[in-house]
Structure formats: C-alpha cells, structure tokens
C-alpha cells in the first residue's frame, strides 16, 4: 500500500433547514395562531481517529466531504429533522490544520478520538417565533443558515515510541525486521527505504512497543534535500531515538555528526530527545577499529553506546534491555504521555 502522510481536503457542514409559515387549523379554533416549525440543524463533518488506518492514501481520491442538510420545519410547531453528520476516518496521529490560517484545529492521537471540523448551519425559525401584540399572524419565517466551510491540511505523524535514525544504508530496516514482524524492503544500496516502516517489538512482559524505521537522512535534510525533510516530523512524537551508525562506512564519526546537525537544524526539540547510539555491522569490522570509533563517539556524546550486528543479532538483546529501561524512565517522568503501548 502506498504511504501518503499529507493531504488537503474540503469540508462543508450541511445547511440548516428552513423555518416555515403555518397556522393552527383546528376545527373549533377559528382564529388559530402561527404554528410554523423551525428547520432542523445541518449535519457536521467530523474527523475520527482509526487505529487500523496507516496512511492518508484515501484522500487522494476523495477530497470533498459534505454533511447532510437539515429538513425544513413542519406545521403544528414541528421542528425539522437534523441533517446526518459525515464521519471521516483518519489514521491515529493525524494533525489537522486550517489551510488558510495555518491554525492547528486538532491532533487526533487516540483511537476513536473525534474532531468537528465543519459545523452544520442552524435551522431557520418558523413563524411562531414572530408572534407579537402588533402582529398576531406573522406571514414570514427565516431560512436555515449555511454550514461552515473549510479547507484543511492533514498531516500524519506516526505514533512510535522509538525512532530509528541514521544515514542511508546504516542498517535500520534490517534491524527493525530482526526485532519485529515488519518486513521492509532491504538491499545494499542507499535509499532502499522510501517510506517509514513500523514494527511492534514485544517486551518480556508481553507488552508491545512501536519502533519506526525512518528513511535515511542526509546533510541538508531539514531543507528538503534527500528524503529526510518529509519524514523528520514522524519522529517528533517519539520518546527515544535509536541512532544507528555504520562502522564500515568511510567516516562513521562524520556520519554521526551529520545526523545530529540535521536534528538540531530541524528544531522542535529533536536534538534534545533521549538517544541511544548503536554501532552496527560489527561483524564486518575489526575490534581495534570498533574500539576507536566508540571512544571518539563517547567524547562527542553522553548517550549510551552499544555495538551490534542487525544481521547476526550480536548485541541486540543488550540493546533492547537498555531501550526498555530508558522507556520505563520516560514513562515514570511523563505519566501524562499520550503515546500508546500496543
């Protein structure tokens, strides 16, 4: 399935039903008063978070959503039926913007959470409301009001607790495939991963934690170079970043610094996010070189450093134990966190 994480849609609430002009016509009431009912309220357009959706792909084909109009009032002071709401399902993690004002209207994080994005119009008043001492038989009523109209931008930010970052070909997809049931495309060339991959990794307790393999970042990603700019926002919600460094690259230290610079340039607190560094592909590196890389990185970062092989799973269990520990710390420090365990 194609991964789409941005879409623009048009939403419109239903028009309110018209009020009507009517009079009482009982057999023994020769001078019956006004009895025109009010129009029904128009339906609203409501976005609803759905955990089984993973992409905004559907909005490439359906971009306009309108709720039903309210019904006109009836005689005998009967109010018209309300218009039916239009419910539009979106993936959990969808941020909703007003396209004209750039105002954030809502952030749909939890399954079943709803957000009304276009209110239905109010129903018009029937002639019964215009009865007065001066006018005992009003011959007019009000039409229903138009529904609210908006153009929206939807942006999906994945709900993952651990974001796996690193340069292209650092082994991110291999790692997430070895840890979970996710089966991303894996090949020995840069930019194999073109979309984020999600995998659920089980703790010894049986609880699951969502890991996100973010497409490889390169220098200038925050300015739109490469693939990173489109996907940096997907790690905004993470509690922990797992930074993979390929020890077989020409300059692993420079690789690490490139990613750190991109996190800082992107902003939104990403450079301050708790981080664990994993030196990957140790099965293809001699011990002396590995020790030298680890020593240099330790001088640049206060993050824990682990040595692993995503292919042979060497060191992976120790890495996972450290991740669980850091997440438990984050949970105890942020009991109000909205990121769900799966």
UniProtKB/Swiss-Prot annotation:
<dbReference type="InterPro" id="IPR031167">
    <property type="entry name" value="G_OBG"/>
</dbReference>
<dbReference type="GO" id="GO:0042254">
    <property type="term" value="P:ribosome biogenesis"/>
</dbReference>
<dbReference type="GO" id="GO:0000287">
    <property type="term" value="F:magnesium ion binding"/>
</dbReference>
<dbReference type="GO" id="GO:0005737">
    <property type="term" value="C:cytoplasm"/>
</dbReference>
<dbReference type="InterPro" id="IPR006169">
    <property type="entry name" value="GTP1_OBG_dom"/>
</dbReference>
<feature type="binding site">
    <location>
        <begin position="280"/>
        <end position="283"/>
    </location>
    <ligand>
        <name>GTP</name>
    </ligand>
</feature>
<feature type="binding site">
    <location>
        <begin position="191"/>
        <end position="195"/>
    </location>
    <ligand>
        <name>GTP</name>
    </ligand>
</feature>
<feature type="domain" description="OBG-type G">
    <location>
        <begin position="160"/>
        <end position="328"/>
    </location>
</feature>
<dbReference type="InterPro" id="IPR006073">
    <property type="entry name" value="GTP-bd"/>
</dbReference>
<comment type="function">
    <text>An essential GTPase which binds GTP, GDP and possibly (p)ppGpp with moderate affinity, with high nucleotide exchange rates and a fairly low GTP hydrolysis rate. Plays a role in control of the cell cycle, stress response, ribosome biogenesis and in those bacteria that undergo differentiation, in morphogenesis control.</text>
</comment>
<dbReference type="Pfam" id="PF01018">
    <property type="entry name" value="GTP1_OBG"/>
</dbReference>
<feature type="binding site">
    <location>
        <begin position="309"/>
        <end position="311"/>
    </location>
    <ligand>
        <name>GTP</name>
    </ligand>
</feature>
<feature type="domain" description="Obg">
    <location>
        <begin position="1"/>
        <end position="159"/>
    </location>
</feature>
<dbReference type="GO" id="GO:0003924">
    <property type="term" value="F:GTPase activity"/>
</dbReference>
<feature type="binding site">
    <location>
        <position position="173"/>
    </location>
    <ligand>
        <name>Mg(2+)</name>
    </ligand>
</feature>
<feature type="binding site">
    <location>
        <begin position="166"/>
        <end position="173"/>
    </location>
    <ligand>
        <name>GTP</name>
    </ligand>
</feature>
<dbReference type="InterPro" id="IPR045086">
    <property type="entry name" value="OBG_GTPase"/>
</dbReference>
<dbReference type="InterPro" id="IPR005225">
    <property type="entry name" value="Small_GTP-bd"/>
</dbReference>
<keyword id="KW-0460">Magnesium</keyword>
<keyword id="KW-0479">Metal-binding</keyword>
<dbReference type="GO" id="GO:0005525">
    <property type="term" value="F:GTP binding"/>
</dbReference>
<dbReference type="InterPro" id="IPR027417">
    <property type="entry name" value="P-loop_NTPase"/>
</dbReference>
<keyword id="KW-0963">Cytoplasm</keyword>
<protein>
    <recommendedName>
        <fullName>GTPase Obg</fullName>
        <ecNumber>3.6.5.-</ecNumber>
    </recommendedName>
</protein>
<comment type="subunit">
    <text>Monomer.</text>
</comment>
<feature type="binding site">
    <location>
        <begin position="213"/>
        <end position="216"/>
    </location>
    <ligand>
        <name>GTP</name>
    </ligand>
</feature>
<comment type="similarity">
    <text>Belongs to the TRAFAC class OBG-HflX-like GTPase superfamily. OBG GTPase family.</text>
</comment>
<keyword id="KW-0378">Hydrolase</keyword>
<keyword id="KW-0342">GTP-binding</keyword>
<keyword id="KW-0547">Nucleotide-binding</keyword>
<dbReference type="InterPro" id="IPR014100">
    <property type="entry name" value="GTP-bd_Obg/CgtA"/>
</dbReference>
<dbReference type="Pfam" id="PF01926">
    <property type="entry name" value="MMR_HSR1"/>
</dbReference>
<feature type="binding site">
    <location>
        <position position="193"/>
    </location>
    <ligand>
        <name>Mg(2+)</name>
    </ligand>
</feature>
<dbReference type="InterPro" id="IPR036726">
    <property type="entry name" value="GTP1_OBG_dom_sf"/>
</dbReference>
